[in-house]
Amino acid sequence: MAAPQRFLPAQAYTDPRMHHWDCSGYAQRYWHPLTAGSALPAGHSLALTLLNQPLLLTRAEDGTPRAFLNRCPHRGVAFQHEREGATACRRLICPYHGWTYSLEGELLAAMREQGFDPPFHRQDWPLPSLPCREDGPLIWVALTQAVTPLEQQLDLVHQRVADLWSQPLDQVRIL
């Protein structure tokens, strides 16, 4: 008689159905570390993909990291491509129609907005934001508002490595 298998079979990690389930369900409930905080200086944006979702991280001059879907709400065009890395910018400008957003996600300008019928209101077109926090040396993002609290998710990390957690990643050496 064969011993019961105690681990998932290898094909579970390569099965496209499992990947879809992970991306569309299970992993949506948790925070994900996307980058080191030091990789996103103030006045920069960074395009990344998380669970097949194109994201754009920004850090305005106030130092707060923010996460948005990397697509203009007007026509869905990406603001920035991943291959560009962290990019210094004061605004996000859609390459399609030139809609211009602040790094906080506020619509600052839209082409020919006076000619819209019904009347156009900028405050109705913010960038869709996602939960985003900096904890320790990392920037964490969740893809839904219904997410496990970050403090709960990182409780064990905070207990075990609290002294290292506040250090920049380039100064941490794990043995």
Predicted region positions:
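Glycine-rich active-site/cofactor-binding loop and its immediate structural neighborhood
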Residues: 47-95
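A short beta-strand motif that forms part of the nucleic acid-binding face
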Residues: 71, 98, 145
